[in-house]
Swiss-Prot record:
A biological-process GO annotation: prolyl-tRNA aminoacylation
Superkingdom to which the source organism belongs: Eukaryota
Underlying gene: Pars2
Primary site of residence: mitochondrion
Function field: Mitochondrial aminoacyl-tRNA synthetase that catalyzes the specific attachment of the proline amino acid (aa) to the homologous transfer RNA (tRNA), further participating in protein synthesis. The reaction occurs in a two steps: proline is first activated by ATP to form Pro-AMP and then transferred to the acceptor end of tRNA(Pro).
PANTHER family: MITOCHONDRIAL RIBOSOME PROTEIN L39/PROLYL-TRNA LIGASE FAMILY MEMBER, PROLINE--TRNA LIGASE, MITOCHONDRIAL-RELATED
Organism: Mus musculus
Protein name, UniProt field: Probable proline--tRNA ligase, mitochondrial
InterPro entries assigned: aa-tRNA-synt_IIb (IPR002314), aa-tRNA-synth_II (IPR006195), aa-tRNA-synth_II/BPL/LPL (IPR045864), Anticodon-bd (IPR004154), Anticodon-bd_dom_sf (IPR036621), Pro-tRNA-ligase_IIa (IPR002316), Pro-tRNA_synthetase (IPR050062), ProRS_anticodon_short (IPR044140)
Amino acid sequence: MEGLLTRCRTLSALAACSLRHCRYIIHKCYHRAPGRGQRLVLSRMFQPQNLREDQVLSLEGRASDLTCKSQRLMLQVGLILPASPGCYHLMPYTVRAVEKLVRVIDQEMQAIGGQKINMPSLSPAELWRATSRWDLMGRELLRLRDRHGKEYCLGPTHEEAVTALVASQKKLSYKQLPLLLYQVTRKFRDEPRPRFGLLRGREFYMKDMYTFDSSSEAAQETYGLVCDAYCRLFDRLGLQWMKARADVGSIGGTMSHEFQLPVDIGEDRLVVCPSCHFSANTEILDLSQKICPDCQGPLTETKGIEVGHTFYLSTKYSSIFNALFTNAHGESLLAEMGCYGLGVTRILAAAIEVLSTEDCIRWPRLLAPYQVCVIPPKKGSKETAATEIVEKLYDDIMEAVPQLRGEVLLDDRTHLTIGNRLKDANKLGYPFVIIAGKRALEDPAHFEVWSQNTGEVVFLTKEGVMELLTGVHVV
Protein backbone atom coordinates (compact mmCIF):
# COMPACT_ATOMS: atom_id res chain seq x y z
CA MET A 1 0.00 0.00 0.00
CA GLU A 2 2.85 2.38 0.89
CA GLY A 3 4.47 1.71 -2.51
CA LEU A 4 1.22 2.55 -4.30
CA LEU A 5 0.92 5.84 -2.38
CA THR A 6 4.52 6.72 -3.26
CA ARG A 7 3.85 6.10 -6.96
CA CYS A 8 0.69 8.21 -6.79
CA ARG A 9 2.59 11.08 -5.14
CA THR A 10 5.28 10.82 -7.85
CA LEU A 11 2.69 10.92 -10.65
CA SER A 12 0.97 13.91 -9.03
CA ALA A 13 4.30 15.75 -8.78
CA LEU A 14 5.07 15.02 -12.44
CA ALA A 15 1.62 16.22 -13.49
CA ALA A 16 2.06 19.43 -11.51
CA CYS A 17 5.50 19.94 -13.06
CA SER A 18 4.07 19.44 -16.57
CA LEU A 19 1.28 21.91 -15.85
CA ARG A 20 3.80 24.49 -14.62
CA HIS A 21 5.86 23.91 -17.77
CA CYS A 22 2.81 24.45 -20.01
CA ARG A 23 1.97 27.66 -18.16
CA TYR A 24 5.58 28.80 -18.57
CA ILE A 25 5.45 28.18 -22.33
CA ILE A 26 2.15 30.08 -22.66
CA HIS A 27 3.57 32.94 -20.59
CA LYS A 28 6.69 33.12 -22.75
CA CYS A 29 4.79 33.08 -26.06
CA TYR A 30 2.17 35.63 -25.08
CA HIS A 31 1.65 38.51 -22.70
CA ARG A 32 -1.59 38.07 -20.80
CA ALA A 33 -3.46 41.14 -19.61
CA PRO A 34 -5.36 40.82 -16.31
CA GLY A 35 -8.87 39.67 -17.14
CA ARG A 36 -8.12 39.84 -20.87
CA GLY A 37 -7.13 37.48 -23.67
CA GLN A 38 -3.59 36.76 -24.73
CA ARG A 39 -1.50 39.35 -26.53
CA LEU A 40 0.42 38.18 -29.57
CA VAL A 41 3.92 39.61 -29.18
CA LEU A 42 6.55 40.09 -31.86
CA SER A 43 9.56 39.10 -29.75
CA ARG A 44 8.41 35.47 -29.83
CA MET A 45 8.03 35.30 -33.61
CA PHE A 46 10.41 32.93 -35.40
CA GLN A 47 11.30 35.50 -38.02
CA PRO A 48 14.94 36.30 -38.87
CA GLN A 49 15.01 39.97 -39.85
CA ASN A 50 17.26 42.69 -41.20
CA LEU A 51 19.74 40.44 -42.97
CA ARG A 52 22.55 42.37 -44.63
CA GLU A 53 23.09 42.09 -48.39
CA ASP A 54 26.17 39.90 -47.89
CA GLN A 55 24.18 37.59 -45.58
CA VAL A 56 21.43 37.27 -48.18
CA LEU A 57 24.01 36.49 -50.85
CA SER A 58 25.56 33.81 -48.65
CA LEU A 59 22.14 32.14 -48.38
CA GLU A 60 21.63 31.93 -52.16
CA GLY A 61 25.27 31.40 -53.13
CA ARG A 62 25.82 33.83 -56.01
CA ALA A 63 25.02 37.49 -56.58
CA SER A 64 23.63 36.55 -59.99
CA ASP A 65 20.98 34.45 -58.25
CA LEU A 66 19.42 37.54 -56.64
CA THR A 67 17.92 39.09 -59.72
CA CYS A 68 14.38 39.89 -58.62
CA LYS A 69 12.93 42.14 -55.96
CA SER A 70 10.57 39.61 -54.35
CA GLN A 71 13.36 37.09 -53.76
CA ARG A 72 15.69 39.69 -52.24
CA LEU A 73 13.02 41.20 -49.97
CA MET A 74 11.63 37.85 -48.82
CA LEU A 75 15.14 36.73 -47.86
CA GLN A 76 16.05 40.02 -46.17
CA VAL A 77 13.04 40.04 -43.84
CA GLY A 78 13.13 36.29 -43.23
CA LEU A 79 9.95 35.23 -45.03
CA ILE A 80 11.83 32.38 -46.72
CA LEU A 81 15.13 30.61 -46.10
CA PRO A 82 16.86 28.38 -48.69
CA ALA A 83 16.95 24.64 -47.94
CA SER A 84 18.50 23.46 -51.23
CA PRO A 85 18.50 24.81 -54.81
CA GLY A 86 14.90 25.62 -55.68
CA CYS A 87 13.54 24.56 -52.28
CA TYR A 88 12.72 26.94 -49.43
CA HIS A 89 11.63 26.89 -45.82
CA LEU A 90 8.47 28.97 -45.55
CA MET A 91 8.61 30.90 -42.29
CA PRO A 92 5.54 31.62 -40.08
CA TYR A 93 4.57 34.91 -41.75
CA THR A 94 4.73 33.28 -45.17
CA VAL A 95 2.72 30.25 -44.08
CA ARG A 96 -0.01 32.57 -42.79
CA ALA A 97 -0.08 34.41 -46.14
CA VAL A 98 -0.22 31.13 -48.09
CA GLU A 99 -3.06 29.86 -45.89
CA LYS A 100 -5.01 33.06 -46.52
CA LEU A 101 -4.48 32.75 -50.26
CA VAL A 102 -5.68 29.15 -50.15
CA ARG A 103 -8.82 30.31 -48.30
CA VAL A 104 -9.55 32.86 -51.05
CA ILE A 105 -8.96 30.18 -53.70
CA ASP A 106 -11.26 27.77 -51.83
CA GLN A 107 -13.99 30.41 -51.76
CA GLU A 108 -13.79 30.98 -55.50
CA MET A 109 -13.51 27.30 -56.45
CA GLN A 110 -16.36 26.23 -54.19
CA ALA A 111 -18.53 29.11 -55.43
CA ILE A 112 -18.58 27.42 -58.87
CA GLY A 113 -19.17 23.94 -57.47
CA GLY A 114 -15.61 22.77 -56.91
CA GLN A 115 -15.08 19.85 -54.54
CA LYS A 116 -11.75 19.67 -52.73
CA ILE A 117 -9.81 16.41 -52.69
CA ASN A 118 -6.22 15.37 -52.00
CA MET A 119 -4.30 13.01 -54.26
CA PRO A 120 -0.93 11.38 -53.50
CA SER A 121 2.23 13.16 -54.58
CA LEU A 122 3.71 9.77 -55.53
CA SER A 123 2.28 8.81 -58.91
CA PRO A 124 2.88 5.34 -60.45
CA ALA A 125 4.93 5.29 -63.64
CA GLU A 126 2.36 3.15 -65.45
CA LEU A 127 -0.17 6.00 -65.36
CA TRP A 128 2.30 8.34 -67.02
CA ARG A 129 3.43 5.74 -69.53
CA ALA A 130 -0.20 5.27 -70.58
CA THR A 131 -0.29 8.88 -71.80
CA SER A 132 3.35 8.83 -73.05
CA ARG A 133 4.17 11.67 -70.68
CA TRP A 134 6.70 9.55 -68.77
CA ASP A 135 9.03 10.09 -71.73
CA LEU A 136 7.56 13.36 -73.00
CA MET A 137 8.22 15.23 -69.73
CA GLY A 138 11.91 14.35 -69.94
CA ARG A 139 14.25 15.30 -67.11
CA GLU A 140 11.79 17.72 -65.48
CA LEU A 141 9.98 14.73 -63.99
CA LEU A 142 11.42 13.74 -60.62
CA ARG A 143 11.51 9.93 -60.67
CA LEU A 144 12.23 7.32 -58.01
CA ARG A 145 12.00 3.59 -57.30
CA ASP A 146 10.74 1.93 -54.15
CA ARG A 147 12.46 -1.05 -52.51
CA HIS A 148 10.57 -3.40 -54.82
CA GLY A 149 11.84 -1.67 -57.94
CA LYS A 150 8.47 -0.07 -58.74
CA GLU A 151 8.83 3.29 -60.49
CA TYR A 152 7.08 6.50 -59.43
CA CYS A 153 7.31 10.20 -60.05
CA LEU A 154 6.71 13.13 -57.73
CA GLY A 155 3.73 14.65 -59.46
CA PRO A 156 4.12 18.06 -61.13
CA THR A 157 0.44 17.74 -62.12
CA HIS A 158 -2.29 15.11 -61.77
CA GLU A 159 -4.20 14.64 -65.05
CA GLU A 160 -3.40 10.92 -65.15
CA ALA A 161 -4.18 10.30 -61.49
CA VAL A 162 -7.51 12.13 -61.41
CA THR A 163 -8.73 10.58 -64.68
CA ALA A 164 -7.89 7.11 -63.39
CA LEU A 165 -9.70 7.99 -60.16
CA VAL A 166 -12.88 9.06 -61.96
CA ALA A 167 -12.65 6.09 -64.34
CA SER A 168 -12.69 3.76 -61.32
CA GLN A 169 -16.19 4.99 -60.47
CA LYS A 170 -18.13 2.74 -62.81
CA LYS A 171 -21.57 4.23 -62.17
CA LEU A 172 -20.89 7.91 -62.87
CA SER A 173 -24.15 9.49 -64.04
CA TYR A 174 -24.76 12.54 -66.21
CA LYS A 175 -26.69 13.89 -63.22
CA GLN A 176 -23.37 14.22 -61.34
CA LEU A 177 -21.87 16.36 -64.10
CA PRO A 178 -20.23 18.78 -64.34
CA LEU A 179 -17.81 17.31 -61.82
CA LEU A 180 -15.20 19.80 -60.61
CA LEU A 181 -12.45 18.27 -58.47
CA TYR A 182 -9.52 20.29 -57.16
CA GLN A 183 -6.67 20.13 -54.69
CA VAL A 184 -4.01 22.43 -53.22
CA THR A 185 -0.83 20.42 -52.71
CA ARG A 186 2.93 20.48 -53.09
CA LYS A 187 4.16 19.86 -56.61
CA PHE A 188 7.64 18.98 -57.86
CA ARG A 189 9.60 19.78 -61.00
CA ASP A 190 13.30 19.22 -61.61
CA GLU A 191 14.03 22.71 -62.91
CA PRO A 192 17.41 22.82 -64.70
CA ARG A 193 18.16 26.21 -63.13
CA PRO A 194 15.88 27.23 -60.26
CA ARG A 195 15.81 31.01 -59.81
CA PHE A 196 13.81 34.00 -58.62
CA GLY A 197 13.02 32.45 -55.22
CA LEU A 198 9.43 31.19 -55.09
CA LEU A 199 8.80 32.22 -58.69
CA ARG A 200 10.65 29.24 -60.16
CA GLY A 201 11.46 26.45 -57.73
CA ARG A 202 11.68 22.69 -57.65
CA GLU A 203 9.01 22.38 -54.98
CA PHE A 204 5.96 24.62 -54.87
CA TYR A 205 2.30 24.81 -53.90
CA MET A 206 -0.27 24.60 -56.67
CA LYS A 207 -4.03 24.54 -56.99
CA ASP A 208 -5.03 22.13 -59.74
CA MET A 209 -8.65 21.57 -60.78
CA TYR A 210 -9.95 18.89 -63.15
CA THR A 211 -13.42 19.03 -64.66
CA PHE A 212 -15.59 16.36 -66.28
CA ASP A 213 -18.56 17.23 -68.51
CA SER A 214 -21.15 15.48 -70.64
CA SER A 215 -20.42 17.28 -73.93
CA SER A 216 -17.95 19.57 -75.66
CA GLU A 217 -20.38 22.48 -75.31
CA ALA A 218 -20.84 21.85 -71.59
CA ALA A 219 -17.08 21.49 -71.08
CA GLN A 220 -16.42 24.83 -72.77
CA GLU A 221 -19.09 26.43 -70.61
CA THR A 222 -17.30 25.06 -67.53
CA TYR A 223 -14.03 26.35 -68.99
CA GLY A 224 -15.48 29.86 -69.08
CA LEU A 225 -16.84 29.44 -65.56
CA VAL A 226 -13.41 28.58 -64.13
CA CYS A 227 -11.71 31.37 -66.09
CA ASP A 228 -14.23 33.85 -64.66
CA ALA A 229 -13.43 32.56 -61.15
CA TYR A 230 -9.73 33.19 -61.81
CA CYS A 231 -10.54 36.74 -62.93
CA ARG A 232 -12.47 37.35 -59.70
CA LEU A 233 -9.61 35.91 -57.65
CA PHE A 234 -7.00 38.27 -59.12
CA ASP A 235 -9.40 41.21 -58.84
CA ARG A 236 -9.92 40.44 -55.14
CA LEU A 237 -6.16 40.43 -54.67
CA GLY A 238 -5.91 43.85 -56.31
CA LEU A 239 -3.55 42.63 -59.04
CA GLN A 240 -3.38 43.74 -62.67
CA TRP A 241 -3.61 40.65 -64.84
CA MET A 242 -3.93 39.52 -68.44
CA LYS A 243 -5.59 36.45 -69.91
CA ALA A 244 -3.39 35.40 -72.83
CA ARG A 245 -3.89 32.72 -75.45
CA ALA A 246 -1.25 30.06 -74.98
CA ASP A 247 0.30 26.83 -76.20
CA VAL A 248 -1.09 23.57 -74.79
CA GLY A 249 2.43 22.17 -74.25
CA SER A 250 2.94 18.68 -72.82
CA ILE A 251 -0.47 18.70 -71.10
CA GLY A 252 -2.24 18.77 -74.44
CA GLY A 253 -5.80 19.60 -75.39
CA THR A 254 -7.31 21.95 -77.95
CA MET A 255 -7.47 25.31 -76.15
CA SER A 256 -5.34 27.02 -73.51
CA HIS A 257 -5.01 30.38 -71.77
CA GLU A 258 -2.45 31.77 -69.34
CA PHE A 259 -3.13 34.29 -66.60
CA GLN A 260 -0.18 36.66 -66.51
CA LEU A 261 0.96 39.48 -64.24
CA PRO A 262 2.79 42.09 -66.37
CA VAL A 263 6.26 42.72 -64.91
CA ASP A 264 9.71 43.38 -66.36
CA ILE A 265 11.37 40.29 -64.84
CA GLY A 266 8.71 38.01 -66.31
CA GLU A 267 10.05 35.09 -68.33
CA ASP A 268 7.10 34.97 -70.73
CA ARG A 269 7.00 37.26 -73.76
CA LEU A 270 3.52 38.46 -74.61
CA VAL A 271 1.89 40.51 -77.34
CA VAL A 272 -1.00 42.75 -76.36
CA CYS A 273 -3.55 44.82 -78.25
CA PRO A 274 -4.31 48.07 -76.35
CA SER A 275 -7.53 48.50 -78.34
CA CYS A 276 -9.42 45.24 -77.78
CA HIS A 277 -7.22 43.75 -75.00
CA PHE A 278 -6.31 40.69 -77.07
CA SER A 279 -3.16 39.07 -75.67
CA ALA A 280 -1.16 35.98 -76.50
CA ASN A 281 2.06 34.25 -75.59
CA THR A 282 4.66 34.59 -78.34
CA GLU A 283 4.92 30.78 -78.31
CA ILE A 284 1.76 30.74 -80.44
CA LEU A 285 2.02 34.09 -82.22
CA ASP A 286 4.98 35.09 -84.35
CA LEU A 287 6.65 38.28 -83.13
CA SER A 288 6.80 39.48 -86.71
CA GLN A 289 3.01 39.72 -86.64
CA LYS A 290 2.32 43.34 -85.74
CA ILE A 291 -1.44 43.37 -86.34
CA CYS A 292 -4.08 42.13 -83.86
CA PRO A 293 -5.94 39.10 -85.31
CA ASP A 294 -9.17 40.23 -83.62
CA CYS A 295 -9.47 43.96 -84.38
CA GLN A 296 -6.57 44.62 -86.79
CA GLY A 297 -5.09 47.15 -84.35
CA PRO A 298 -1.34 47.43 -83.63
CA LEU A 299 0.23 44.94 -81.18
CA THR A 300 2.73 45.81 -78.46
CA GLU A 301 5.13 43.49 -76.65
CA THR A 302 5.50 43.04 -72.89
CA LYS A 303 6.73 40.49 -70.34
CA GLY A 304 4.76 38.62 -67.72
CA ILE A 305 4.83 36.09 -64.88
CA GLU A 306 2.47 33.18 -65.48
CA VAL A 307 0.37 32.64 -62.35
CA GLY A 308 -2.45 30.53 -63.78
CA HIS A 309 -3.08 28.23 -66.75
CA THR A 310 -6.27 26.69 -68.15
CA PHE A 311 -6.68 23.86 -70.68
CA TYR A 312 -9.63 22.40 -72.54
CA LEU A 313 -8.56 18.75 -72.86
CA SER A 314 -11.55 17.26 -74.69
CA THR A 315 -11.21 13.45 -74.39
CA LYS A 316 -7.40 13.19 -74.49
CA TYR A 317 -7.17 11.60 -71.03
CA SER A 318 -10.66 10.16 -70.62
CA SER A 319 -10.20 8.06 -73.78
CA ILE A 320 -6.94 6.57 -72.46
CA PHE A 321 -8.28 5.68 -69.00
CA ASN A 322 -11.84 4.98 -70.15
CA ALA A 323 -13.43 7.64 -67.93
CA LEU A 324 -17.09 7.12 -68.79
CA PHE A 325 -20.45 8.44 -67.66
CA THR A 326 -23.95 7.18 -68.39
CA ASN A 327 -26.24 9.60 -70.24
CA ALA A 328 -30.03 9.95 -69.99
CA HIS A 329 -30.50 7.10 -72.48
CA GLY A 330 -28.29 4.70 -70.54
CA GLU A 331 -25.41 4.98 -73.01
CA SER A 332 -21.79 5.07 -71.80
CA LEU A 333 -19.88 8.06 -73.18
CA LEU A 334 -16.43 9.53 -72.65
CA ALA A 335 -16.29 12.51 -70.32
CA GLU A 336 -15.09 15.82 -71.76
CA MET A 337 -12.33 17.25 -69.58
CA GLY A 338 -10.57 20.47 -68.64
CA CYS A 339 -7.70 21.19 -66.26
CA TYR A 340 -6.86 24.42 -64.48
CA GLY A 341 -3.80 25.41 -62.46
CA LEU A 342 -2.90 28.24 -60.09
CA GLY A 343 0.64 28.58 -58.77
CA VAL A 344 -0.09 29.36 -55.12
CA THR A 345 3.41 30.21 -53.91
CA ARG A 346 4.13 31.84 -57.27
CA ILE A 347 1.09 34.12 -56.93
CA LEU A 348 2.35 35.18 -53.50
CA ALA A 349 5.87 35.97 -54.75
CA ALA A 350 4.59 37.62 -57.94
CA ALA A 351 2.24 39.84 -55.92
CA ILE A 352 5.18 40.94 -53.75
CA GLU A 353 7.19 41.54 -56.92
CA VAL A 354 4.63 43.89 -58.49
CA LEU A 355 3.31 45.64 -55.36
CA SER A 356 6.45 46.22 -53.27
CA THR A 357 8.86 49.12 -53.25
CA GLU A 358 12.59 48.47 -53.61
CA ASP A 359 13.02 48.31 -49.82
CA CYS A 360 9.63 47.38 -48.38
CA ILE A 361 7.23 44.51 -48.89
CA ARG A 362 3.64 45.30 -49.82
CA TRP A 363 1.02 42.57 -49.76
CA PRO A 364 -2.38 42.22 -51.32
CA ARG A 365 -4.48 43.43 -48.38
CA LEU A 366 -6.25 40.07 -48.01
CA LEU A 367 -2.96 38.15 -47.80
CA ALA A 368 -1.02 40.24 -45.27
CA PRO A 369 0.13 37.79 -42.56
CA TYR A 370 -0.98 40.23 -39.85
CA GLN A 371 -3.21 43.23 -40.43
CA VAL A 372 -2.00 45.46 -37.59
CA CYS A 373 1.26 46.10 -35.72
CA VAL A 374 1.05 48.05 -32.45
CA ILE A 375 4.22 49.85 -31.32
CA PRO A 376 4.44 50.96 -27.65
CA PRO A 377 6.96 53.60 -26.46
CA LYS A 378 10.60 52.76 -25.83
CA LYS A 379 11.25 51.64 -22.27
CA GLY A 380 12.64 54.51 -20.20
CA SER A 381 11.60 57.20 -22.70
CA LYS A 382 9.50 60.25 -21.89
CA GLU A 383 6.47 58.45 -23.34
CA THR A 384 6.83 55.32 -21.17
CA ALA A 385 3.62 56.19 -19.33
CA ALA A 386 1.72 55.61 -22.59
CA THR A 387 2.62 51.90 -22.54
CA GLU A 388 -0.41 50.96 -20.44
CA ILE A 389 -2.63 53.13 -22.62
CA VAL A 390 -1.59 51.43 -25.86
CA GLU A 391 -1.74 47.95 -24.30
CA LYS A 392 -5.31 48.69 -23.25
CA LEU A 393 -6.00 49.81 -26.82
CA TYR A 394 -4.67 46.45 -28.03
CA ASP A 395 -7.01 44.61 -25.65
CA ASP A 396 -9.97 46.78 -26.65
CA ILE A 397 -9.33 46.02 -30.34
CA MET A 398 -9.41 42.30 -29.56
CA GLU A 399 -12.78 42.68 -27.83
CA ALA A 400 -14.45 45.21 -30.13
CA VAL A 401 -13.19 43.97 -33.53
CA PRO A 402 -13.54 40.17 -33.42
CA GLN A 403 -12.39 39.61 -37.02
CA LEU A 404 -8.95 40.94 -36.02
CA ARG A 405 -8.34 38.40 -33.28
CA GLY A 406 -5.05 36.75 -34.16
CA GLU A 407 -4.35 39.53 -36.69
CA VAL A 408 -2.75 42.13 -34.40
CA LEU A 409 0.89 41.98 -33.25
CA LEU A 410 2.27 43.92 -30.30
CA ASP A 411 5.90 44.90 -30.95
CA ASP A 412 7.14 44.41 -27.39
CA ARG A 413 10.81 44.98 -28.25
CA THR A 414 10.76 48.13 -26.14
CA HIS A 415 14.56 48.23 -25.90
CA LEU A 416 14.40 49.58 -29.47
CA THR A 417 13.29 53.06 -30.44
CA ILE A 418 9.90 53.61 -32.04
CA GLY A 419 11.74 54.63 -35.23
CA ASN A 420 13.64 51.35 -35.49
CA ARG A 421 10.51 49.31 -34.93
CA LEU A 422 8.55 51.41 -37.42
CA LYS A 423 11.29 50.74 -39.98
CA ASP A 424 10.92 46.99 -39.42
CA ALA A 425 7.12 47.24 -39.64
CA ASN A 426 7.42 49.16 -42.88
CA LYS A 427 9.72 46.48 -44.36
CA LEU A 428 7.32 43.68 -43.43
CA GLY A 429 4.34 45.56 -44.83
CA TYR A 430 1.66 45.36 -42.13
CA PRO A 431 -1.32 47.21 -43.65
CA PHE A 432 -1.72 49.27 -40.45
CA VAL A 433 0.83 50.36 -37.85
CA ILE A 434 -0.37 52.01 -34.63
CA ILE A 435 2.21 54.00 -32.64
CA ALA A 436 1.95 55.32 -29.08
CA GLY A 437 4.11 58.45 -29.17
CA LYS A 438 3.94 61.63 -27.12
CA ARG A 439 0.39 62.40 -28.25
CA ALA A 440 -0.77 59.19 -26.57
CA LEU A 441 -0.30 61.10 -23.28
CA GLU A 442 -2.85 63.74 -24.28
CA ASP A 443 -6.41 63.73 -22.99
CA PRO A 444 -7.92 62.11 -24.93
CA ALA A 445 -5.03 59.99 -26.15
CA HIS A 446 -4.18 60.21 -29.85
CA PHE A 447 -2.40 57.39 -31.66
CA GLU A 448 -0.30 57.74 -34.80
CA VAL A 449 -1.75 55.41 -37.44
CA TRP A 450 0.18 54.52 -40.59
CA SER A 451 -1.68 53.05 -43.56
CA GLN A 452 1.15 51.29 -45.36
CA ASN A 453 -0.67 50.66 -48.63
CA THR A 454 -1.65 54.30 -49.14
CA GLY A 455 1.21 56.02 -47.29
CA GLU A 456 -1.32 58.02 -45.27
CA VAL A 457 -0.47 58.96 -41.65
CA VAL A 458 -3.19 60.21 -39.29
CA PHE A 459 -3.63 60.80 -35.56
CA LEU A 460 -6.75 59.16 -34.16
CA THR A 461 -8.39 58.75 -30.78
CA LYS A 462 -9.22 55.26 -29.56
CA GLU A 463 -12.70 55.63 -31.04
CA GLY A 464 -11.20 56.67 -34.39
CA VAL A 465 -8.87 53.67 -34.38
CA MET A 466 -11.80 51.35 -33.68
CA GLU A 467 -13.86 52.86 -36.47
CA LEU A 468 -10.96 52.47 -38.92
CA LEU A 469 -10.20 48.86 -38.01
CA THR A 470 -13.84 47.76 -37.97
CA GLY A 471 -13.83 48.13 -41.75
CA VAL A 472 -10.84 45.80 -42.25
CA HIS A 473 -11.85 42.61 -44.07
CA VAL A 474 -10.03 39.38 -43.18
CA VAL A 475 -10.31 35.98 -44.87
